[in-house]
């Protein structure tokens, strides 16, 4: 399945523990979507259009009124990407 680069970046961030939080207007309509990483940074690639596309494909879902997280379908459709994080492993 073809997904755009911003969608890929957003899914990778979600797979690493990020969440998507929504901003609504007075009428309850979604006006903005923000992807917050596990470290608290905001991902610039995540826009309202990216959010709607990922939700339409059911790659993300909200549970119990909480922030949106990656689903099993979203994780399956991720392409392999080198992780930039450096981990210290003893041994």
Curated annotation (Swiss-Prot):
Q: Which Pfam families match?
A: YjhX_toxin
Q: Name the InterPro entries on file.
A: YjhX_toxin
> In terms of domain of life, where is this protein from?
Bacteria
What family does this belong to?
Belongs to the UPF0386 family.
Q: What is this protein called?
A: UPF0386 protein Caul_4643
